[in-house]
């Protein structure tokens, strides 16, 4: 966070000087998506939009084998426990082939389950679909750069063509 807020953003501001449509977005892939969400959530005075591609929303406080429950997912808890509602909009993406893990044996892969659960937590805070939350599930999409590269233009259009 210190690097993004103290070095990267000032560098971008110096190099480019303005925003597109007056909006600032922070996006990332996989663990970078989790990080983008976390940083934007805690700095909604700076960021307006969050993009998460195949986000590592499974990140948890304890191992699956040690009495794990879905309440142990760190980002879900952060959203749930934050008293206010940051002024943000969210673009969330998963691929149907991001992985094969099915933690709860419901025939839905973990990345989709966890992302849908993030959406549910956001909606409990008062965010609305599609006004505040856009979810894109790419059929055949994998957890890799070629997939994310294919959907990046969709995110950029959502974020900046408004």
Residue ranges and their predicted role:
Residues 1-162:
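Non-catalytic cap/lid and distal C-terminal segments of serine-dependent acyl enzymes
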